[in-house]
Amino acid sequence: IATLFAYIGIIVGWQKLGLSFNFLYLSSGGLTVLIAVLCLFFFPHFRTETQPKTKLVIRRRYCLYYALEFLSGARRQIFVVFAAFMMVEKFGFEVHQLTALFLINLVINIFVAPLFGYFIAHFGERRALLIEYSGLICVFLAYGGIYIFDWGVVLAATLFVLDHLFFGLRIALKTYFQKISSPEDIAPTAAVALTINHIAAIFLPVLFGLLWLVSPAIVFMAAAFLA
C-alpha cells in the first residue's frame, strides 16, 4: 500500500508540483531513517523455538540454490537497470511516465501474486521456475529486437510489464529453499544468498554498461543467455 501511494504521489507530484530528484531522495531518505528509529524502539522482539546460527553457512547441498540466486540477481539487474534505461534512452520516458509503468506492475502483481502462490503449491517449484525463465528469455530477446527491428513504444511497455510479471514467480525459489534447508540454516544461508545476489548487482551493471556502449541489443541477448 505504501508503495502504491508513493508511485501515485510521484506521478501526480512530478507534473503538478514540479518535484525534483533532490526533494524525492532527501524526503524518502529522511522518512526511511525515521521509520528505522521507530522500529528500533517500538518493534517487538520475537523468540523462536529454533535458535538460528549467527555465522554464515555455506553447504554443498545448497549449491544449486546459490547458483539460482546469482542468476536471479543478474536477471533482476536487467529489468531494474537496462530495461528502465531503454525506456528513457530510446523512447524518452520521463520520471512520471516510467513510474506509471511501475504502478501498473504493482497493481497487476497485487492480483496475480496469489495465483502464482496457488500454482507453485499445486504444480511445484520446478514448473514455476521453468515458466519464469522461459518467459524471461522471450522478453529479453524481444528487448533486443526493439533495437534491431526498431519496434515501437507500445511493445516495449508491454514487455516491461511482462518482465516484472514473470519475476513474480521468483517466490518459487524461496519455497524451494525452505524445503531443502534445515530450520537453523535458514537465516545464515539466506544471508549468503543475499550476498551472492548482490554480487551480480554490483558487477553486472558495470560489465553490461560497457557492453551497452557497443550495442544495447547484445546486452539483452546476453541477458537471455543468463535466463
Task: Describe each region flagged by the PLM.
Residues A2-Y25, F85, E89, F203-F220:
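Transmembrane alpha-helix termini and helix-breaking/packing motifs in multi-pass membrane transporters
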Residues I10, G29-T48:
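C-terminal membrane-cytosol helix-exit motif in multi-pass small-molecule transporters
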Residues W14, V112-E125, W212:
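Helix-to-loop junctions at the C-terminal end of transmembrane segments
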Residues V81-L98:
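Short amphipathic helix-loop junctions that connect adjacent transmembrane helices
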Residues H122-S134:
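Cytoplasmic membrane-interface "Motif A"-like loop-to-helix N-cap segments
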Residues G135-F149:
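C-terminal ends and interior cores of transmembrane alpha-helices
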Residues V153-G168:
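Hydrophobic core of transmembrane alpha-helices in multi-pass small-molecule transporters
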Residues G168-S181:
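Intracellular juxtamembrane helix-capping segments at the cytosolic ends
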